[in-house]
């Protein structure tokens, strides 16, 4: 078979996505997974899938002088299992009638030869047709099975072949790219901070501990202190895309034990409102570019999970913490001016702001001192901080603030939070030698995507999610 295949002259190896009617009559070579196959006795039909694209391939049962497959080859092709990875050489033929069930609807490939590069086991953990069916297709075909999400996660490599999953991680990649691009275009330098630390970065108890050469170390729950030290070191604008670790036994649909942090820190030239405006402009740029560059992926996801286009403005809608408390009190929600918002109150605020301002994203600033970490700049007289959260579709997607840059104030606030200054020695020492005013934010990538699409399960946006119940695969 290999020898005969090599004698079939083709016009190069082609991606399925690049096949179109202009190749009518030309011989090509394509590779992909066997998504579907059927045999009517006289004909074999195979739907070949590569990434998010599919094409129908067909061959006729051979007769003497047919010039196609031999009878042994025809019999062998009929036995190829679903999800096997194969190469097909054949002639592109333009079709007069639309081919349903394929992304390439006006062409098919008439098979002249093939080879199996990797055979798939007959016993698949789930049928790809079941996880590839859109909401509309499910309504029309009630025989399609619902595959439990934990089974999909247990077999994540195969699940990544599903169109919705593939499109999701294409969009996730786009968000990281646009985040990095915007910051680099605005003078930011990328840094990589240590994820092995000697003590808590924020005084919390939710840390993973590891053995580190006969002593205890911890997995970083934030790059916060290192970002600030980079600014103190003279790098005016820095950012990081890196993993963050939180040992929280919380709702696995909302929190991950390991997630990707999009962090940035910058010097402040005027006041902290400049940082708020900059972050909002960055998010607007990301949202604009997603619509412009990832329209196909967004529509693929929409076919499986309906979501509304995001509503936002060029300039941010900014409300103070006190103003937001007043809005909630008017809605009958009981809370005080010193209280932080929980997930329910954030959701309520999201609907109120959408009704009042017609946007899905807004900023809450000036949180009470009691609700923020020790490194947050304070206005002691007013009892508030120069801090801010961004709320997207009723969910917090980032938290940030102007930071404390005066050494004696920082030591005082550390002690007030019940943290020993000696445990933060390297961080605190750096502020002894002068520090510019600075601020920034930390964005949870998976949380941002969850809010953007309005989905209920954050694990959908982690390639191999880690939560209190999952350490596999």
From Swiss-Prot:
One of its GO terms (cellular component) is aminoacyl-tRNA synthetase multienzyme complex. The keyword Ribosomal protein does not apply. It catalyses: tRNA(Asp) + L-aspartate + ATP = L-aspartyl-tRNA(Asp) + AMP + diphosphate. The keyword Protein biosynthesis applies. PROSITE patterns: AA_TRNA_LIGASE_II (PS50862). PANTHER family: ASPARTATE--TRNA LIGASE, CYTOPLASMIC (PTHR43450:SF1), ASPARTYL-TRNA SYNTHETASE (PTHR43450). This is Probable aspartate--tRNA ligase, cytoplasmic. It comes from Encephalitozoon cuniculi (strain GB-M1).
């Amino acid at each position: 078979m290999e020898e005969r295949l090599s004698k079939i002259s083709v016009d190069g190896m082609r991606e399925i996505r690049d096949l179109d009617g202009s190749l009518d009559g030309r011989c090509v070579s394509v590779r992909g997974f066997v998504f579907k196959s059927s045999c009517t006795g006289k004909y074999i039909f195979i739907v070949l899938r590569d990434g998010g694209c599919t094409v129908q391939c067909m061959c006729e049962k051979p007769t003497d002088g047919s010039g196609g497959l031999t009878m042994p080859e025809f019999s062998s092709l009929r036995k190829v299992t679903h999800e096997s990875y194969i190469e097909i050489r054949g002639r592109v033929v333009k079709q007069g009638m639309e081919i349903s069930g394929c992304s390439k609807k006006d062409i098919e490939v008439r098979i002249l030869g093939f080879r199996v590069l990797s055979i798939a086991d007959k016993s698949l953990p789930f049928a790809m047709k079941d996880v590839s069916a859109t909401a509309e297709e499910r309504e029309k075909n009630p025989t399609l099975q619902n595959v439990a999400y934990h089974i999909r996660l247990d077999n994540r490599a195969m699940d990544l072949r599903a169109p919705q999953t593939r499109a999701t991680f294409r969009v996730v990649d786009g968000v990281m790219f646009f985040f990095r691009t915007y910051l680099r275009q605005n003078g930011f330098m990328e840094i990589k901070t240590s994820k092995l630390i000697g003590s808590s970065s924020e005084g919390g108890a939710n840390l993973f501990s590891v053995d580190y050469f006969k002593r205890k170390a911890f997995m970083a729950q934030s790059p916060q202190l290192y970002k600030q030290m980079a600014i103190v070191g003279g790098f005016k604008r820095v950012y990081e895309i890196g993993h963050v670790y939180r040992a929280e036994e919380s709702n696995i649909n909302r929190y991950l034990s390991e997630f990707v942090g999009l962090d940035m820190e910058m010097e402040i030239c005027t006041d902290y409102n400049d940082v708020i405006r900059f972050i909002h402009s960055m998010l607007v740029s990301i949202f604009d570019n997603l619509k412009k560059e990832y329209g196909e992926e967004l529509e693929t996801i929409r076919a499986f999970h309906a979501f509304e286009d995001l509503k936002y403005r060029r300039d941010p809608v900014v409300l103070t913490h006190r103003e937001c408390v007043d809005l909630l009190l008017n809605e009958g929600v009981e809370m005080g001016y010193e209280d932080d918002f929980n997930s329910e109150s954030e959701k309520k605020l999201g609907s109120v702001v959408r009704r009042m301002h017609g946007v899905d994203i807004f900023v809450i600033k000036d949180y009470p001192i009691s609700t923020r970490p020790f490194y947050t700049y304070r206005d002691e007289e007013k009892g508030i901080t120069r801090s801010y959260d961004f709320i997207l579709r009723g969910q917090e997607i980032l938290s940030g603030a102007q930071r404390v840059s005066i050494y004696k104030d920082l030591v005082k606030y550390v002690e007030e939070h019940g943290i020993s200054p000696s445990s933060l020695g390297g961080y605190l020492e750096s502020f002894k030698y002068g520090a510019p005013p600075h601020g920034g934010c930390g964005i949870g990538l998976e949380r941002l995507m969850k809010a953007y699409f309005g989905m209920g399960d954050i694990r959908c946006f982690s390639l191999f999610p880690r939560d209190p119940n999952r350490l596999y695969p």
